[in-house]
Regions:
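N-terminal small-domain helix-loop-helix segment of the aminotransferase-like
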Residues: 1-36, 40
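Short acidic capping loops at alpha-helix termini that bridge into adjacent secondary structure
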Residues: 24-28, 49, 136, 158-159
Length: 311
């Protein structure tokens, strides 16, 4: 109700999230968007040396820069289709890294680290006193969520926090609602102490509960995205001018193979057709000409495919 303050502990909301994620409500912290939780985690860890797996979302490095620590990058390799090579990853990790940041599925590559590999990463990091932040903003779009999500690993490992939001899958960025999951009670308490009270308004808390119980929306959205994503991925694979990478999020990364054709050329052509795609030239560590586009409704997707076929 709007005339009264929200429950300061968000008890009912955490219970609903716990049921949705199959996790104890005691392991959950809610935030004013996943961005608040990312900022809070980074500021509280005070990492001396953070490792970010890229190319990825630029906000991580911006927040890390505010803490004054050193930032290093491990870049996914195009010749491996942006899939993480665990052996090379572990071998290249500096001994003094104390915070690892992953986006899974990753933005902008749409690649993903499977749960079994994530367990190896968490084991390695646990042995080397490295805390791991996993941004799962796009995980609900994955063909098999259980195959990707690390939430099931938070009971086993206390050196990890998984962060999610409702901006993408639930198409509700205006709510500013995110949540984090960790079994590290000491760290969780530190986060709660440094959070502003009532950081989530009553409307967002109520909407969050309704969203996580809406099985019809969840199933319909997943069916649409999965079927259309497969259709677009296969279609682009047959276009000689492009190379598409196996997608796990609600978008596809495409490399332009045709000489003299640039990402801006395609961006401009799409704008003329009243479509918006991402020119990826601004992403660090993404060498070459790339575009990225989101999966839309079938009609818009077909419209984009017809445009790409012209090249």
């Amino acid at each position: 109700a709007l005339p009264i303050y929200p429950d300061r502990n968000y008890t009912s909301l955490k219970k609903t999230i716990g049921e949705y994620c199959h996790i104890s409500p005691e392991h959950i912290v809610v935030g004013n968007g996943s961005t608040e939780l990312i900022s809070l985690l980074i500021s509280q860890r005070q990492a001396k040396k953070a490792l970010v797996v890229g190319p990825t979302y630029s906000e991580y490095e911006r927040e890390l820069a505010l803490t004054g620590g050193t930032i290093t990058e491990y870049n996914l390799k195009e010749d491996l289709n942006f899939q993480l090579d665990l052996e090379d990853f572990f071998a290249s990790m500096a001994e003094d890294v104390d915070l690892l940041i992953l986006c899974n599925p990753n933005n902008p590559t749409s690649s993903a680290i499977k749960n079994r590999d994530m367990k190896h990463i968490l084991t390695f990091c646990n042995e080397h006193n490295i805390f791991v932040m996993i941004d799962e903003t796009y995980v609900e779009f994955a063909p098999d969520i259980a195959e990707i999500t690390a939430i099931s690993l938070t009971d086993e490992f206390d050196n990890v926090m998984v962060i999610r939001g409702v901006s993408k899958f639930y198409a509700a960025p205006g709510l500013r609602f995110g949540y984090g999951i960790t079994s590290n009670h000491e760290f969780l308490e530190a986060l709660l102490i440094h959070q502003n009270p009532w950081n989530l308004n009553s409307v967002a808390a109520y909407a969050g509960e309704r969203m996580f119980k809406d099985n019809t929306y969840q199933q319909t959205t997943r069916q649409l995205i999965c079927s259309e994503r497969d259709r677009m991925y296969m279609a682009i694979q047959n276009m000689p001018a492009f190379k598409a990478y196996k997608p796990y999020a609600n978008f596809i990364l495409v490399r332009i193979l045709k000489e003299s054709l640039t990402s801006f050329d395609i961006f401009e052509a799409a704008i003329k057709e009243r479509m918006m795609i991402r020119d990826c030239s601004s992403f660090k560590s993404l060498d070459g000409e790339y575009i990225r586009f989101c999966i839309m409704n079938p009609e818009d997707n077909t419209h984009l495919l017809k445009l790409l076929e012209q090249f």
